[in-house]
Swiss-Prot record:
Cell location: Plastid, Chloroplast thylakoid membrane
GO BP term, example: electron transport coupled proton transport
Identification of the protein by name: NAD(P)H-quinone oxidoreductase subunit K, chloroplastic
Key words, A-Z: 4Fe-4S, Chloroplast, Iron, Iron-sulfur, Membrane, Metal-binding, NAD, NADP, Plastid, Plastoquinone, Quinone, Thylakoid, Translocase, Transport
Assembly mode: NDH is composed of at least 16 different subunits, 5 of which are encoded in the nucleus.
Entry cofactors: [4Fe-4S] cluster
Function as written in the Swiss-Prot or TrEMBL entry: NDH shuttles electrons from NAD(P)H:plastoquinone, via FMN and iron-sulfur (Fe-S) centers, to quinones in the photosynthetic chain and possibly in a chloroplast respiratory chain. The immediate electron acceptor for the enzyme in this species is believed to be plastoquinone. Couples the redox reaction to proton translocation, and thus conserves the redox energy in a proton gradient.
Binding site residues for [4Fe-4S] cluster: C43, C44, C108, C139
HAMAP family per UniProt: NDH1_NuoB
InterPro entries: NADH_UbQ_OxRdtase-like_20kDa, NADH_UQ_OxRdtase_20Kd_su
Cofactor note: Binds 1 [4Fe-4S] cluster.
Taxonomic source organism: Lolium perenne
Amino acid sequence: MNLIEFPLLDQTSSNSVISTTPNDLSNWSRLSSLWPLLYGTSCCFIEFASLIGSRFDFDRYGLVPRSSPRQADLILTAGTVTMKMAPSLVRLYEQMPEPKYVIAMGACTITGGMFSTDSYSTVRGVDKLIPVDVYLPGCPPKPEAVIDALTKLRKKISREIVEDQTLSQNKNRFFTTSHKLYVRRSTHTGTYEQELLYQSPSTLDISSETFFKSKSPVPSYKLVN
């Protein structure tokens, strides 16, 4: 090649050649185009909605919200997760293609929040249902904290290895966190919940004789002391 015909070749060739590995290229493409599935159930999701505006502009991170779990690789849980919603959340996570990531946003998602002390219907930590990659505490977290969590997740993706991802997929990825909880005495001191177990019989279950007998007037001699 004649360098006289291409005098700028030696100056631009060093900037046009990229040397990398397939693993790093895959990580770079995934961290630059995260497609989140927004699972918001409470007030924490309102703070995440602030990122859509022009002040924070979460599009610069390549985030494209999706409405289907089959098209998402990131699920962001924000808010309280109840026992009734737990199977739906696990089903959404299982429908996401690998590799997939989870961000737990807010105190209610991480530990149950103010419902964790004495609630019969609240999941005390979403990591009991699905594995969590980044914990974002707060009540609620600010939009700047959400951006910091996304940055930490991008750094985690950049250090991943394909072989490690394959091994993690074959293992049981649920119940990844063992909480150090202390058993305390229940705060239920009354019997106010027992009345819910008693249901008065309907009029269809009562015979006509018993019904009219109960409706009969009280004799006058029973009114006298």
